[in-house]
Amino acid sequence: MDFKVFGKEGAPSLLLIPGLGVSYEIFLPLIGLLEARFRILAVQVDGFTLGTFTRFTSIDDQAAQVIAYVKERQGGRLDCAYGLSLGGKILSRVLERNEVVIDHAILDAAPLLPLPRWLEGPLRYYQCANVWTCYHWTGFWRRVFHSHYFDVLLDECRKVYPFGGGRAVLDGYKSVFPVGIQIKVVNIFSFFNNSL
């Protein structure tokens, strides 16, 4: 994992975590608008770093690296953090571990659905079956995604797929916030307007 830093020292901090298959460059237009007023930390997720080879191992590993960086470089505190898609899932794990203080967290299109318990198993099997069939029947996903990342994804699918004996991992829909984080919906624009 790599971090790109923009903006001035001492300004309110803003962490940006991109989604699957993209680098921090997806945020460059936003960074251009906000770097005069914020200290922006843009994450390059393992497996999608530009210019260096890295391997994506797990969402928990990515969250641990974000936490370590925030503790070391930001004193364990952020004013705002934004996670897009997979970045939102990583950010949810950072929040779940409760090791750093984040005043405002925005999880955009993160795979966090409030589902009834009885629906967790069937949905997990359904998702794994989709990935499994796409991989084995067309090979499409292996061409789209970094091959090592896809191998990790398939390993997770094998744990819950019927042939894997149903060894489900605690991920995705099963228990997103085991430490009881309360989510408060706020107007995110008020944060940016007050800070601008």
Predicted regions, residues:
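Conserved HGGG/HGGXW glycine-rich cap/lid loop of the alpha/beta-hydrolase fold
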Residues: K4-T52
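Structural signature of beta-strand start/N-cap positions in the alpha/beta core
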Residues: S13, R39, L78-C80, I102-H104
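Active-site signature of alpha/beta-hydrolase-fold catalytic machinery across serine-
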Residues: P29, R93-R97
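Active-site loop/oxyanion-hole signature of alpha/beta-hydrolase fold enzymes
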Residues: L41-Y82
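Gly/Ala-rich beta-loop-alpha elbow adjacent to hydrolase catalytic centers
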Residues: G83-L91
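Conserved alpha/beta-hydrolase catalytic His-Asp/Glu region
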Residues: R117, T133-V185
